Amino acid sequence: RKSQNWIGGASLSDAAFIPPDQDAIGPLLDDLEAFWHNESVQVPHLIRIALSHYQFETIHPFLDGNGRIGRLLITLYLVNHGLLAKPSLYLSAHLEKHRSQYYDALSRARASNDIGQWCRFFLQAVIETARNGKDTLERLFVMKQDFDTLVQGMGRRAENGAKLLSFLYNCPVVSVHEVMESANLSMNAAHALIREFESVGILEEFTGQKRNRLYVFSGYIAVFRGVQDGV
């Protein structure tokens, strides 16, 4: 950013927090990057990430999007250091659900230098997010087994059904044309396969239209909605 920003309130005069002046951003980010990569500093990875996230959010280097970028940096660090094979740990849902506590923890660290309570909050967020991720993976595994069994019981449509099911994990909302492409089907064959998938509860039509219909892989999406809702 090239101007002063603030957090909370309608102006600088009643802001809850005023980040550093724009002229200080460069040196502060250099310092943060140096800490980020300084392996001689003996600190556990998650504590390093917690401190770095706090510092990034305090610097607030952009006029908008600081939270999104700050959360993305958490995942990138874990992948870059080989702690995650894939970017599968995102704290956004947890932090959004506990937004007030998140902001309070950051504010307390800034106001009273109580970095310990911030680290405890952050570590608990990681624990709960990892636990939810594990639960989600287990539910997806069970769901996949159930759907595989349903498709295998589709007789002569089983082979094309397996192709469509595999496609749905990458594209959970499809049109009839996408179903045609997924298994190299004719229009009539695609409609027949869609009806088969609807009859066993794999797909649901959700537009209510006569034309240009769309079908959703509802069970798959429901697993992730359950995570967001804390189920």
How would you label these PLM feature ranges?
Residues R1-V231:
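FIC/Doc superfamily catalytic core
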